[in-house]
């Protein structure tokens, strides 16, 4: 299987998760930041990791999602919100909507530590972003448990691709 693993990361959280996926998947694979990502055509699976900005995938990832066409797509996100929060769920739904023809193989999201500089800016907003109350609990994430859960989600998606 030929896999393209693309990520956008500002603080290293999403890159860390993308590198874990790269270590998990066998076969021919390419790992690269979104701004250096090749055309996704010709890959059996595209894995895209992104961070959230305003409750949506970051702008570079949003632009890349428009290019995936009907590819098999696995999406994952890191964010300051709690895992399973309405904010995270809505953001993932928005990500899917940016690639309407893609075959969604699976999704995953988890908290990611928010940089102190960004957190300081977010605290000054009126109203504050919906994830701000969850941000302290995101410290130290993604951690080994988050990576293990991502690995489970990816492994669960792979058999569906072989069918």
Predicted regions mapped to residue ranges:
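Generic structural signal for beta-strand residues in well-ordered domains
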Residues: 7, 38-40, 66, 97
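N-terminal beta1-alpha1 ligand-phosphate binding loop
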Residues: 2-24
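Short acidic low-complexity segments
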Residues: 30-42
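Structured loop/turn residues at beta-strand edges in well-structured enzyme cores
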Residues: 1, 41, 102
């Amino acid at each position: 299987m030929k896999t393209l693993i693309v990520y956008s990361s500002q603080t290293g959280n999403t890159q860390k998760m993308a590198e874990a996926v790269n270590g998990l998947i066998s076969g021919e694979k390419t790992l690269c930041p979104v701004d250096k990502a090749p055309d996704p055509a010709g890959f059996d699976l595209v894995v895209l990791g992104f961070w959230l900005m305003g409750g949506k995938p970051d702008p570079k990832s949003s632009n890349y999602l428009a290019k995936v066409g009907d590819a098999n797509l696995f999406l994952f996100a890191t964010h300051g919100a709690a895992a399973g929060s309405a904010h995270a769920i809505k953001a993932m739904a928005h990500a899917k909507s940016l690639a309407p023809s893609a075959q969604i193989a699976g999704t995953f999201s988890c908290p990611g530590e928010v940089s102190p500089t960004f957190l300081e800016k977010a605290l000054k907003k009126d109203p504050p972003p919906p994830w701000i109350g969850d941000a302290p609990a995101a410290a130290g994430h993604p951690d080994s448990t988050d990576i293990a859960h991502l690995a489970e989600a990816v492994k669960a998606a792979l058999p569906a691709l072989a069918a």
